[in-house]
UniProtKB/Swiss-Prot annotation:
It catalyses: (1S,2R)-1-C-(indol-3-yl)glycerol 3-phosphate + L-serine = D-glyceraldehyde 3-phosphate + L-tryptophan + H2O. NCBIfam families: trpA (TIGR00262). This is Tryptophan synthase alpha chain. Keywords: Amino-acid biosynthesis, Aromatic amino acid biosynthesis, Lyase, Tryptophan biosynthesis. The gene is trpA. The keyword Lyase applies.
Amino acid sequence: MTTRIDTKFAELKAEGRPALVTYFMGGDPDLETSLKVMKALPKAGADVIELGMPFSDPMADGPAIQAAGLRALNAGQTLAKTLHMAAEFRKEDNTTPIVMMGYYNPIYIYGVERFLADAKASGVDGLIVVDLPSEMDAELCIPAMKAGINFIRLTTPTTDDKRLPKVLHNSSGFVYYVSMNGITGSAIADTAKVGEAVRHIKKSTDLPICVGFGVKTPEQAAAIATHADGVVVGTAIVNAIAGELDENGKAKGDPVAAATRLVHALAESVRATRLEAAQ
């Protein structure tokens, strides 16, 4: 199968530049605002969109993304509404890849077969489910592949040579390298070590490698971009949105403008980095 993710990374490889992968939480601070953010991301320079699925017990998320998920849930966001966001986005944009990211529990409750059918119909291209290890591929990974949806795995600095083949088995779309141990948004990555890790993973796969966790500024994104096929930014975007909200999580400023300003700056830095490296 060839998905929008495969097509996008092939295009970017031909252009000689890495991808900017942008994460935000579906339904934060509300469905309408969140959908506006989603629609604005490609115009601001996002190459791939990670659409967060809010969950009440997000063990791998830092405080910012946990708070975003809570705001979304309090505003009435559901998995069905998050899928609806993808479908609405697809009415205007049929090329930007959408990756839904979150935890298995909401998908399990929704029903795996129903979820995959609805995700495919809504124009979703990939899934990142952080709490489903490769030993549980039969639960969702293999059914997703059969449905034509990429299943994207996380690798970390502690993924050793014995574990790596298991992580990569049945992976598709791209590999998400978590540049440090811990929760999202927790620290700053060591770019030299990131480069070494990416080169090591590439010995075992032809999939693009995207690096995330700890990328907050355009400068950090540019530094990571010299080593990877893509840079993932999430917490910084979530924080940009949160900065425009009042103490009750309601918009007091312009969350859409704040998010797009940041993404535009990130995109400019990421794109310039590879161009400079190619000269």
